[in-house]
Structure formats: structure tokens, C-alpha cells
Amino acid sequence: MITTTPASLEVALYKAADVIRYAQNIAILTGAGVSAESGISTFRDKLTGLWQQYQAEYLVSIQAFEKEPALVWQWHQWWRGQIADKQPNPAHFALGEWQALAKQQGKTWTLFSQNVDNLHEQGGATVAKLHGDLGKNRCHDCAKPYDKAIAVTDTELKHCECGGLIRPDIVWFGEMLPQDAWQTAETAALNCDVLVSIGTSSVVYPAAGLIDLAKQQGATVIEINPNPTHTTAVDIVLPDNAGKILPLLVKALK
């Protein structure tokens, strides 16, 4: 981890603000670190309790659902229960405020996220969800949205009119990203003057490739992460929690 003094962090913060201030097109990528500050566990955290014998990576795979659909559905319902009471943190609210500020200034500002919760929306920001939305369901076979309300305590498998099983509308390992969300993110990365990567490990592809794409097009890349990734594409590192850095950054942009 990069060690910084308060003074050096302040210098990096204002350097980042200066770059962003003169940017017309701004792209934002968020990852699990942003949600972690609201108490939502990341996939790097070991499962506990009833689920400690399983690997999270297995439970979010298409292979697991096709082999053990009841198990996978039960785990996702448990996961939904875990995040149901979680609230946006200062990072989410700062992003919502930043989006409104950028609009006021006539700038293009695009947020795309690897997170499947709805904390960005609660914080006031519009977001393209690269890995889907845990709050929604769809048919595994025909992909038709399933709009009936399902309590997080309901662990019984549901079926679509076509006979297919209902599943969470998120991207599992082995699946393609949602086309609309990916197109939004890719277009933003191609056209941005600055890309800000927040709370992401920069190792989960294809989303992580958006950082390289922006860099190749000449964008400045800024990373906000308490554990910097040391990705070579990064120009400015702000090594602290998003909940601390983003409110300061947005304040500096006003």
C-alpha cells in the first residue's frame, strides 16, 4: 500500500480536482469498495455462518444455477436479506451531487458500476449497471423480466410462464454483460477526458478493460482506493476511502 501524509494526499486531491475541472467528458467506474463502506461484503470476503462451506464465486456462476438451482436461489435470497437495510454512504451522496454539478456546468458525466445494489440510485446518481441489478429478477430461459414481488425470506424456486426458472437479474461468472450498460460504459471510456476508478480492484474483466481503453484514448486516469492497485494506467492515486475523498473532491470542484 502507498503511504501518504495528509499534505501529500491534499496535493494529489487538488491535482485531481484541477484535471477534472478542465475536463468536458467525465467517466466514473465504481466497484465493491464503494459498497463495502456501507457494510456490504465483497466477494473477496469469506462467507460465514450457514454458507461458510461454499465459495461465493461458485454460487454466482451459471454452472452452479444449472446444477443446483435451489441452492443458488436460496443464497441470493440470503444475500438480498443482508443488503436490504444498507444505506448510501458519503461516497454515494457525493457522486449524486457531482452528477448534478456536472449537468449544471454542461459537462458529460457518466457513472458505470460493477455493483449490483441500488445505493448509487439512493444517493441520487444515475448509473449503468455492468453486472446487473440484484433487486430485479428474470427468466433464466427466455430472459423475460419477472415483476412479481418476492420477499427476501421466500426461498422457493419460481417459474416463468414459459416454464423456465426465475433468477436474479445479475451477471454470473460465465455470462455476458448487459449490452445497454456495456455500450454506455464503453462509449464513455472512449470519449472521456478523465476516468475516475473508485473502489475497484481493476482485475475483473471486461469492466477493468475500460480503464485501459480510456488511457489509450488519451484520458487521465484517477484512482480512489485505500489499497491502490498499482495499475500502470493510473496517473493520479488518492489512497483513501471513497467516503472520505469524494466529498472533498466534489467540494473542490465547486
Describe each PLM feature range:
Residues 1-254:
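Conserved catalytic core of sirtuin-type NAD+-dependent deacylases
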